[in-house]
């Protein structure tokens, strides 16, 4: 059974599609990377999948008992978060809101601790989020997303703004989560990394240019290692 | 000096002023944290000008309690701003500037066309803009209304504290975790409007922004967690209001301006503390 099924979806704003004809599905253990140029509608697609935007047409279905508030989402950094006063723990705990009552119980605090340990940021839990490095901030956002759901993560350009070493680390963290059974849907314009780490690729333009496994994508776009940009 | 103070405190209207002043400052400083972090402080400013227009209209209509008109008008406009803000992004701030300066002008016009009975126009305008004496002339009913509304604001803030954090830090994520953010924004718009209507009595329309902005900005310079910023902001706002009120009662300076002066002094103090802390950790 698929965790997420998208059928003939058009995603866009106020009834005007940005990208259309999109179909794909994500099952447990999958690792899908959505690639495409800036402005091709990757973020718009992800927000539609999350229910933040209404679909222009087509369908988004969540399966296997996955509820709307049980998807882990790692958004791109927004400008407002740069100087925001919040401790790492406060940020991570906010991932439990979909499950908690008005206040956090021990269960949610334990969950936050567990996910921070998993992301190796437990010692940073009382530090200021705004003073962390870019990579540490991304780990905090990952831990927050994992608190919300650990069957599927949706990540919007998780490597944006990170230096090459930290980028590499980030991809490895995401891969290890995938090996632990977390389905990954990731937006990236780092095609090289997508080819290495992911299992399926969705190449988005106004219409999807490609959807299928990595090997087919390599054959189609990278004949003998020669890059068609 | 203590004796003079005790003497003043024996008057009920002075006690009323202190109670209401502290409560309004508390609410404003809590909401201010959210407004500053969401970069919406300009909305507070605009709403306070709208409230001035509504106050003028209420005076012209000779209402028994001006709040009866000011409160609903400000709440409705606040909600309208919230909704139009989502749609017409491009010139939203210019439209808001137009609306707020327009209601200032119309308000002043109304004060002149329908001067309050027995009052003088410039005195009334001055009171409504700068809150010169209104806090000292509260009736018992006004005091109760302020107490109840402020208590409601504080209780709501505490109950929904974690959700307010999530909504402020990352709206998209909050929605993705199932939060009905539209509802919370509606509530927030109504609460901000309520606090601004109440604050008209304390500092007057032009100085309300100070109550919202100074405590939050000062606390953010010193503290790094949301909880500490919220708590510090509340203490900061209340202390500045108390200090300003006491000084103005003792020395006879205008209430609103004295409170804002206390806020400014606190801001510089916290700025220095922030620099000092940074210097030690760097
Ligand atoms: N809030 C919005 N309203 C209308 N159009 C938007 C909005 N946000 C983005 N767009 C447009 O949608 C297109 C796709 O944007 P986006 O999904 O962010 O692209 P990507 O993430 O692939 O870089 C762009 O042309 C952009 O201008
Ligand atoms: Mg994008």
Model feature map: region roles:
Chain A
Residues 128-132:
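Conserved ABC ATPase signature
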Residues 200-214:
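H-loop (His-switch) and adjacent beta-strand-loop-beta switch element
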Residues 164-166:
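Helix N-cap at the start of a conserved alpha-helix in ABC-type nucleotide-binding domains
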Residues 106-124:
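Conserved ABC ATPase "signature" region
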Residues 153-156:
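Catalytic Walker B motif of ABC-type/P-loop ATPase nucleotide-binding domains
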Residues 188-189:
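H-loop/switch region of ABC-family ATPase nucleotide-binding domains
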